[in-house]
């Protein structure tokens, strides 16, 4: 009976992970949410009744330690798979060129992105590592982004979401550092994976956001002419899970791969 912990599990891709994993009654599935009283957290209680949930902000090490003890009680001591999904994408810089950001916004968005998407991931891994060591699968996965691939960014001028993208690139290296430090010697898989291009339900975009999305879609089609539409979140989760289940420390330790298990991002 494998156990999974998904951070950022109250909505979006994190909720899709919980929904898919909990469809197998043999799985022990736990969602980590920042605030159970948030309106975004209601799906955990209202729809996925076989999902456990614990509360912690991933930038708060003390709260994460408390959550780890709660997870230990749920699983009986170990944890098979940790999926670091919680992340922040600052809306002010999502489709604004770097040179058009004010110095204050530039600094704020980079620091916020790195605090959550890099430091928060490190705090989360450290808090749950003792449980991973006692698990069977021993896998620590960080959800990254195709925007974090330098060659793709350079070759196809993907200039959007700069703070988010650089924080995800740093998170990729963080996984490689964990692998270098203890992954190979302890048999723990540390890996970053891009979910691909995924459609996400949201509010109607502004005119500027809509234009930014159109420009990005055109660049992605130049990279992958076969690309016709984003995947649904459910499609992305299924493909990611297949890659994760087949990944090994020997072949994928410290790697950054796509939802296809390679460097083909779409």
Curated annotation (Swiss-Prot):
Highest taxon, organism lineage: Eukaryota
* Keyword presence, NADP: yes
Xref: Pfam families? adh_short (PF00106)
Q: What practical use does it have?
A: Secalonic acids show unprecedented anticancer activities against various human cancer cells and might be interesting for further derivatization, targeting diseases such as cancer.
| Pathway recorded for this protein | Secondary metabolite biosynthesis
Record's keyword annotation contains NADP: yes
Q: Which InterPro entries would you find in this protein's record?
A: NAD(P)-bd_dom_sf, Sc_DH/Rdtase_CS, SDR_enzymes, SDR_fam
List the Gene Ontology MF annotations in alphabetical order. oxidoreductase activity, acting on the CH-OH group of donors, NAD or NADP as acceptor
Q: Per its UniProt record, what PANTHER family does this chain match? A: CHAIN DEHYDROGENASE (ATSC), PUTATIVE-RELATED, SHORT-CHAIN DEHYDROGENASE/REDUCTASE SDR
Q: What does this protein do?
A: Short-chain dehydrogenase/reductase; part of the gene cluster that mediates the biosynthesis of the tetrahydroxanthone dimer secalonic acid D. The pathway begins with the synthesis of atrochrysone thioester by the polyketide synthase AacuL. The atrochrysone carboxyl ACP thioesterase AacuM then breaks the thioester bond and releases the atrochrysone carboxylic acid from AacuL. Atrochrysone carboxylic acid is decarboxylated by the decarboxylase AacuI, and oxidized by the anthrone oxygenase AacuG to yield emodin. Emodin is then reduced to emodin hydroquinone by a yet unidentified oxidoreductase.
> What is the protein's given name?
Short-chain dehydrogenase/reductase AacuF
Q: Which organism is it from?
A: Aspergillus aculeatus (strain ATCC 16872 / CBS 172.66 / WB 5094)
